[in-house]
């Protein structure tokens, strides 16, 4: 469909991404518009091309790659605004409006759990299917567009739903569809981005993710009195942005490439990556799962926390945007610093460990200060921690992928660790609250332990410093 980027010569064959020289030797800083030389910095627009590890080539971080970096950040923002607005604001309010205050926690836990398991199954399937896809538009774009289109229709179904069963069915379709968009989108990083600049790339991509997740909560609160309109707006935004992303960053046609025959055993293995054969992948998955869970277990449930734990009741919705802005402030600071700093130092793991410690510390404030002030401090400090983690997360994950031929499938498995905690957070939190007799206090010490475990989980990773 298009020719390879003029700025990034096409690599002769796909190879396993490897650590760039600046991750194993003297650190090099990478700035937008700069030029670097690295053994694996060849860039190709071909959908099956990974980052080359052949002879050193100059890579200019500008032109098509810069456009890809910026537009992928916006694409993440659009999709994750749905994950911020719907399970964090719109869905809890819709459930509360149907079942009432007394049954809202348990009911939301059930709906969230069902949807989360749908997401868990959809992610690796989406990756595997996109890896096998042959089309004039490449292997990622068709599924990204189809995902946001079907997901948008499902959100309209949620807007029209007036029973819990209808909501649950529509929410399952939303989870599956948007994960079919999100999985192939995330696979673009190892497909088309040089390893040496993945930290900076991941920082911008992670910034879009966080702006979407937190901005979605802020915007979602604005639709508290008109939930169906909110669903319509977020569905339209995702559709528009993803279509523009595909148009602005086209892949070459891959219709002439061989497609392996479908194998049921191989398909079932999609859901399993051996921790014995690929321990770095296992620890990367575990760290991401725990850090996301520790963060979203409180952030994703903060509407009910504000209502019942802080005691704001009707004023809780108005406080959500305030907390979102504070969290965004912390996120902006740490994200814009963390990724480039990681590239400069040539280290990822230390940033993850620091981020996990900050996240754990943030949860202390609402525990000892069950007030609006305590929640405001939590919002800013947790934004610092999670933003720091997001700034290096994608880069770190891309370095532990076990196979050069199954980028999207493996990233689909890894994305379970991000999507599952975020969508399941209301369910986990609701189950804890119900188990302790409608008491919210245990959420915070449990979150602290989970965040700390997530931080230290990256220590055994050997392929990344």
Question: What residue spans do the PLM features occupy?
Answer:
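Structural signature of the two symmetry-related core transmembrane helices
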Residues: 140-156, 350-365
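Glycine-rich segments within core transmembrane alpha-helices of 12-TM secondary carriers
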Residues: 118-120, 199-221, 415-426
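Multi-pass alpha-helical transporter architecture, strongest
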Residues: 241-249, 445-465
């Amino acid at each position: 469909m298009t020719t390879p980027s003029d700025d990034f010569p096409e690599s002769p064959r796909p190879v396993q991404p490897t650590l760039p020289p600046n991750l194993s030797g003297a650190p090099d800083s990478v700035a937008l518009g700069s030029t670097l030389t690295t053994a694996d910095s060849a860039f190709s627009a071909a959908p099956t091309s990974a980052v080359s590890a052949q002879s050193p080539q100059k890579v200019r971080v500008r032109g098509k790659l810069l456009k890809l970096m910026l537009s992928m950040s916006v694409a993440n923002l659009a999709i994750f605004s749905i994950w911020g607005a719907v399970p964090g604001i719109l869905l809890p309010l819709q459930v509360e409006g149907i079942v009432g205050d007394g049954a809202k926690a348990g009911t939301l836990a059930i709906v969230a759990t069902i949807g989360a398991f749908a997401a868990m199954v959809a992610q690796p399937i989406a990756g595997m299917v996109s890896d096998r896809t042959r089309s004039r538009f490449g292997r990622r774009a068709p599924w990204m567009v189809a995902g946001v289109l079907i997901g948008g229709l499902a959100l309209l179904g949620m807007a029209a739903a007036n029973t819990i069963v209808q909501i649950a069915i529509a929410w399952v379709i939303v989870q599956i569809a948007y994960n079919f968009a999100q999985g192939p989108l995330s696979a673009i990083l190892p497909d088309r981005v040089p390893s040496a600049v993945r930290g900076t790339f991941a920082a911008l991509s992670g910034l879009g993710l966080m702006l979407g997740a937190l901005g979605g909560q802020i915007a979602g609160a604005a639709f508290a009195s008109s939930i169906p309109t909110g669903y319509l707006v977020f569905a339209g935004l995702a559709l528009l942005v993803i279509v523009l992303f595909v148009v602005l960053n086209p892949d070459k046609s891959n219709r002439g490439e061989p497609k392996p025959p479908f194998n049921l055993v191989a398909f079932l293995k999609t859901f399993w990556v051996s921790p014995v054969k690929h321990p770095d992948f296992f620890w990367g998955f575990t760290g991401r799962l725990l850090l996301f869970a520790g963060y979203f277990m409180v952030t994703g449930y903060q509407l009910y926390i504000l209502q019942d734990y802080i005691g704001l009741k009707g004023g809780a919705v108005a406080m959500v945007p305030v907390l979102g802005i504070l969290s965004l402030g912390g996120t902006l600071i740490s994200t814009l610093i963390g990724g480039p700093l990681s590239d400069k130092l040539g280290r990822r793991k230390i940033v993850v460990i620091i981020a996990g410690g900050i996240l754990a510390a943030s949860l202390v404030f609402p525990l000892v200060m069950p007030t609006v002030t305590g929640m405001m401090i939590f919002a800013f400090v947790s934004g610092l921690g999670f933003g720091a983690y997001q700034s290096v997360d994608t880069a770190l994950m891309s370095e532990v992928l076990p196979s050069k031929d199954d980028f999207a499938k493996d990233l689909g498995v890894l994305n379970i660790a991000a999507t599952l905690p975020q969508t399941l957070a209301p369910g986990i939190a609701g189950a804890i609250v119900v188990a302790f007799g409608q008491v919210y206090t245990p959420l915070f010490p449990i979150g602290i332990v989970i965040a700390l475990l997530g931080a230290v989980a990256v220590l055994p990773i050997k392929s990344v410093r």
